[in-house]
Every structure is written in C-alpha cells, then in structure tokens.
C-alpha cells in the first residue's frame, strides 16, 4: 500500500511476513514488522499426577474409544466446523473410520449469537451432529460429542491432553492459538495435529498435517494420514510433536512481548540519536 502511494519502501513484505522501513516525505521513517503472538506455554505443559488421572477419567467417560479427535473453536462460520463434521461423516460412511473405535469431540464456545449468520451456523452444525449420531451411534455411544458452552482452562487442558488428533481447520486465521495450546499440552510427544494451511500457526507448526479446509477431500486425507501414522509410525509422530512442542515453548508469549518491546526501544533510541 505504501508503494502504491509512491512512498520510498525498503524491505520485503508478503501475506505472512513483513520487515520494512517506510520513508515519509517529512523525513520520518516508519518501521514495519510482523510479531506472531504466542501462548504462555508453561501454563499448559505441566500435568500433575492428579491431572493425569482426570485425563484418564475423561477418556473413560467418553467410552474409552481407541482414538479421540478433538475440535475446539468459537462457534463461528470461519472456523470450518461444519466442513470437518462433513469430512468425519464421509470417512465413517465409506468405512475408512470405524464408529466403534473413533470419537469426535467438538467444543464450540458461543459467539455473536444475536447475529443471523451465526445463528444459521449453529443450526447447521447441530443438525450435522444429530445426523451423524443418528446414522452411526449406538445407545450410550455417540460418535460425536458436541458441547455448546465455554470450558474452564483446567478442563480444556485435559481435553487437549486426551485427544489423539487435534483438528484445527479455519478458513482463514491470523494465528490460531488453539493449535499451540494443544501442542504445549503434549510434552511427551503424543498426539497429532491436523492444521489448516490458511492459519498463521502453520508457518511455525510445520510438522502438522496441513490441509485445505475448503476441500473436504484434503481434510479427510490429512485426518486419515494422522491417524494412520499414530498406528504405523509412532516414533516419527513423537518426533514431529516434540519438534512442534520445542517451537511453542521456545517462542512463547514472553519472547513475543520481549521482541515487540525490543523493537520499540530500538526505534526510540534511533529517533533520539537522529
């Protein structure tokens, strides 16, 4: 945009990264940078013996399925919830997934409920959940567990730790901290992450199974590949998760704030010395 205005710009910029200096006609220089936000990883990583017991109890309450898939989102049409439900249903329909062995848990936090578009999204999601359970569940054993309310952080950590596969499939997301929170909870290298290629977190969590959320076949393939790798290549999966865990813990919210404030201090010093 600055170049279109005819301003002198030094540096590089893309849809994901920017490091540039813009010189204004008055002689002032503006520095532009990208500072990907992160999480307080330590708050998610450490699990006490009691908390590990809570994780096991939660899994038991779900019927102790062989594999648990988890989605955690605001109930927002941009999060791709309906598309992941469609992908899950089609995998059950073709027999690629066994409803006796796999369960999908979708936690959907209420969001902008007064707006018609969000009301419609909720209606479609809940209709899909009912349809899938009507087709593939048996008494006392739903294949989709759906919750439309907020979840306390302590319980959310247990859900993260319990999940074998995390599904994060937004159509577009500047970052998506849910993906980082899930990875932070798996300091033992367990689990797998299926992540939208259009989430900002995909740049940092490049060991995830990336998918195009607009393409149901892409979501299905990524989910199946993640589940298959958990069975066939556990050591490889562990290394992938540990690599992402290291990324999240080393580039936490503290480093983010330090880098941001450091650039501000540097700019202040440069202006003072000008």
Predicted regions and their residues:
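Catalytic cores of carbohydrate-active enzymes across secretory and cytosolic contexts
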Residues: 1-274
């Amino acid at each position: 945009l600055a170049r279109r205005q005819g301003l002198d710009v030094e540096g590089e910029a893309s849809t994901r990264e920017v490091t540039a200096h813009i010189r204004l006609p008055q002689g002032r220089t503006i520095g532009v940078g990208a500072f990907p936000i992160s999480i307080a990883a330590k708050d998610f990583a450490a699990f006490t013996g009691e908390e590990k017991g809570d994780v096991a109890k939660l899994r038991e309450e779900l019927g102790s399925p062989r594999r648990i898939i988890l989605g955690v989102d605001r109930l927002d049409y941009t999060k791709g919830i309906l598309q992941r439900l469609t992908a899950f249903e089609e995998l059950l329909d073709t027999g690629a997934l066994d409803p006796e062995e796999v369960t999908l848990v979708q936690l959907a936090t209420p969001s902008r409920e007064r707006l018609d578009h969000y009301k419609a999204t909720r209606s479609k999601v809940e209709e899909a959940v009912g349809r899938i359970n009507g087709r593939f569940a048996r008494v006392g054993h739903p294949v989709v567990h759906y919750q439309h309310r907020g979840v306390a952080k302590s319980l959310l950590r247990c859900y993260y730790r319990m999940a074998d596969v995390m599904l994060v499939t937004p159509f577009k997301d500047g970052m998506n901290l849910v993906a980082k929170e899930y990875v932070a909870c798996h300091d033992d290298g367990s689990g797998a992450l299926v992540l939208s290629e259009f989430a900002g977190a995909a740049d940092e969590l490049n060991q995830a199974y990336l998918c195009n959320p607009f393409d149901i076949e892409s979501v299905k393939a990524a989910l199946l590949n993640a589940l298959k790798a958990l069975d066939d290549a556990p050591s490889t999966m562990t290394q992938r998760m540990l690599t992402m865990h290291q990324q999240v813990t080393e580039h936490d919210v503290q480093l983010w704030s330090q880098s941001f404030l450091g650039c501000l201090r540097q700019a202040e010093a440069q202006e003072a010395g000008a």
